[in-house]
Swiss-Prot record:
This is Glutamyl-tRNA(Gln) amidotransferase subunit C, chloroplastic/mitochondrial. It comes from Arabidopsis thaliana. The keyword Translocase does not apply. The keyword Lyase does not apply. Its EC number is 6.3.5.-. The gene is GATC. InterPro entries: Asp/Glu-ADT_sf_sub_c (IPR036113), GatC (IPR003837). GO terms for molecular function: ATP binding; glutaminyl-tRNA synthase (glutamine-hydrolyzing) activity. Subunit of the heterotrimeric GatCAB amidotransferase (AdT) complex, composed of A, B and C subunits. Residues 1-52 form a transit peptide.
Length: 155
């Protein structure tokens, strides 16, 4: 359930908190800071806003509406689960707020601590020769595509 809730936070609708996969900051459209600016992210095609506060060095972030996130993620939550998720998400937001205060300007970017970044494997496509065994194990197969049952209802 926590993973689904986190995914819902990432891809929730506007006016909710977002965790950007490419940055370590939590970004929000609803916060109590004095200045906001909005930035359109074309690859993800959803709005992300950064919030800055001139009063303090960290932004005050509002927790998301968990009931709406559950509806967006198409999961059903009881009121007790909603309350539990709200407290967990609030703790995560507070934790990321602490991370925003860390100065990382002097830290060199690295893939891993023990690697220098030059010994990664080449990203080359590979052909799988035993396609017939895969086709035999799949119940519904049409041309080059797998047929799977519909799992989401369009409402």
């Amino acid at each position: 359930m926590a993973t689904r809730a986190l995914l819902a936070v990432i891809y929730a609708s506007p006016n909710r908190c977002y965790i950007s996969p490419s940055r370590i900051k939590i970004q929000s459209l609803t916060c109590s800071s004095s200045s906001h600016y909005y930035q359109r992210q074309s690859r993800k095609n959803h709005r992300i806003a950064r919030s800055y506060s001139s009063d303090s060095d960290s932004s005050v972030l509002q927790p998301p509406d968990v009931a709406r996130l559950a509806q967006t993620a198409r999961i059903s939550l009881t009121p007790a689960e909603i309350e539990e998720c709200e407290t967990k998400i609030r703790r995560v937001i507070d934790w990321f707020g602490q991370l925003q205060q860390v100065d990382v300007n002097s830290v060199e970017p690295a893939i891993r601590a023990e690697m220098d970044g030059g010994n990664l494997r080449e990203d080359a496509p590979e052909t799988f020769d035993n396609r017939d065994s895969i086709r035999a194990s799949i119940p519904s197969f049409e041309d080059a595509y797998l047929k799977v049952p519909k799992i989401l209802n369009k409402e």
